[in-house]
Regions:
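Short, charged/polar "capping" segments at the starts of alpha-helices
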Residues: 49, 249-250, 277-285
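Short, acidic, metal-binding catalytic loop of nucleotide-sugar glycosyltransferases
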Residues: 259-267
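Short beta-strand/loop segment that forms part of the nucleotide-sugar
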Residues: 269-277
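GT-A fold catalytic core of metal-dependent nucleotide-sugar glycosyltransferases
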Residues: 314-371, 377-379
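Non-catalytic N-terminal targeting/anchoring module and adjacent flexible stem/linker
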Residues: 1-223
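Catalytic core and acceptor-binding pocket of nucleotide-sugar-dependent glycosyltransferases
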Residues: 385-434
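N-proximal low-complexity "stem/linker" segments adjacent to membrane-targeting elements
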Residues: 208-247, 251
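Active-site-proximal specificity loops/subdomain of glycosyltransferases
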Residues: 280-328
Length: 434
């Protein structure tokens, strides 16, 4: 690993998830309201908190250097709270110049006074949260023997290894985590990292998420589950495919259809695939047909029983239907998230994309299970595309049947199915930055 470019580029969500909880019992010597504001309520008011922290009284028997170490670490935490994804409403906003260095300076001042394990772990978490990956890895390397049972550090290290594709080091971390399940703490993201790492190392996990469908020629899903309410008229137009439940249909999909009509007129068809579609949904679709004259509508549905992880079913089953729709329509299909809007004529966009047969979206700095994003796919009905989508559909269908209703299942399928394609077919896929 060098420079940690991928870790620096990854979404703040991933730098937050293993750094939200800071275990620092040493801070109990500080006024409880200050500690709570910083470590539990994630105060970002450094201007107010820093002087309060530094002036806070501590027990007289506590060594002055140890007290100062705790104070510097709390100052670092107050600064690092500014990096939380929740503080930026999910937007990726670059930190102010010198921000990382300021956090690092407090960490250095803390650890040169007291390098107790809890302080080192907290320091690693704070540096990782603000994107100071070099500093975090430096501390891990220097204190490795003392951190072998630290769950937060092992999880952070595994994420760094996977992001930077250092699978040799990842294997060591995976072995450590899986040797003591208490370290994993049943966190779904940790289990996701482990199974993805094992697959990249040549294994084939069959629990949590079952990777066997990537390599086994299983039968295709049972497409007889689909019910047609409004048949698809045969056209050569690209069909916009929108799959959602009734709530999302009424909250979002109607606006999406309106944006398709506003920007593309009747040049695109629209197919709505509504999970647990009821009479109210069908009636509304027929009203939309009248409201958008000339727009070719079609409607299908499937029944999904209430289950744990129903949102995973909603997100994933659309890719199973995509494979079926591509063959049934015998025309290009563009899958879109129901809560997006179309802003430009598709013909202009597709020309700019070299009239590609398969267009996938990606994101710089995405982890390996998000190499392909699920919000947009364009596919023509070619044999190469059928092969790819067959694998995706089998993977999703088998995992949902096994109740592996894990978040990111759809993107795991889309991302790892690419690895099974011949190199020449992979090279022909157009990848666009989301």
């Amino acid at each position: 690993m060098n420079q940690f470019a991928q870790c620096r580029a990854m979404h703040q969500y991933y730098r937050d998830i293993f750094t939200r909880t800071i275990y620092l019992p040493e801070a109990d010597v500080m006024p409880s309201h200050l500690v709570a504001e910083i470590l539990h309520f994630w105060s970002t008011d450094y201007a107010a908190m820093e002087p309060a922290i530094m002036a806070a009284p501590v027990p007289p028997e506590l060594e002055a250097e140890k007290a100062l170490a705790i104070k510097h670490l709390l100052c670092a935490a107050t600064l690092a709270n500014q990096a939380f994804d929740s503080k930026k409403q999910g937007h990726q906003i670059a930190a102010a110049e010198g921000f990382g260095e300021q956090v690092t300076a407090h960490v250095v001042e803390a650890l040169k006074r007291d390098d107790a394990v809890n302080l080192v772990v907290a320091a690693i978490q704070l540096l990782f949260r603000v994107g100071e990956i070099d500093g975090a890895v430096f501390l891990i390397s220097n204190h490795l023997s003392r951190l072998s049972n630290s769950a937060p550090v092992l999880k952070i290290l595994l994420l760094i290894c996977l992001m930077e594709e250092d699978y040799n080091q990842a294997q060591v971390v995976i072995q450590t985590l899986t040797s003591d399940f208490a370290l994993i703490e049943e966190e779904s993201l940790v289990l996701l990292m482990i199974v993805c790492g094992i697959y990249k190392l040549g294994g084939c996990p069959d629990s949590f998420i079952d990777f066997r469908p990537l390599n086994e020629p299983l039968p295709l899903p049972d497409y007889s589950r689909y019910t047609w309410h409004i048949p698809k008229a045969a056209t050569d137009n690209t069909t916009v495919l929108v799959s959602c439940d009734p709530n999302y249909f009424f909250e979002h999909a109607q606006a999406l259809v309106a944006s398709v009509y506003d920007t593309n007129g009747t040049a695109l068809d629209v197919h709505l695939h509504i999970y647990n579609c009821d009479a109210r949904c069908e009636a509304r679709v027929r009203e939309m047909q009248a409201a958008f004259p000339g727009l070719n509508f079609s409607l299908s549905s499937e029944v999904i029983a209430p289950v744990r992880g129903i949102n995973v079913h909603y997100a994933s089953r659309r890719f199973v239907f995509l494979r079926y729709a591509l063959e049934q329509f015998d025309a290009p299909v563009m899958l879109l998230d129901a809560d997006c809007l179309v802003r430009k004529p598709w013909a202009d966009v597709h020309t700019r994309l070299d009239d590609a047969d398969l267009i996938l979206t990606c994101s710089d700095g995405a982890p390996l299970w998000e190499r392909v994003l699920g919000g947009f796919i364009y596919a023509r009905p070619t044999q190469a595309n059928f092969r790819y989508l067959d694998i995706v559909a089998r993977f999703i269908d088998r995992n949902l049947a096994a109740e592996n209703n894990e978040w990111f299942l759809d993107q795991v399928a889309l991302s790892f199915a690419l690895d099974t394609l011949p190199a020449v077919e992979q090279m022909q896929i157009r990848r666009e930055e989301a």
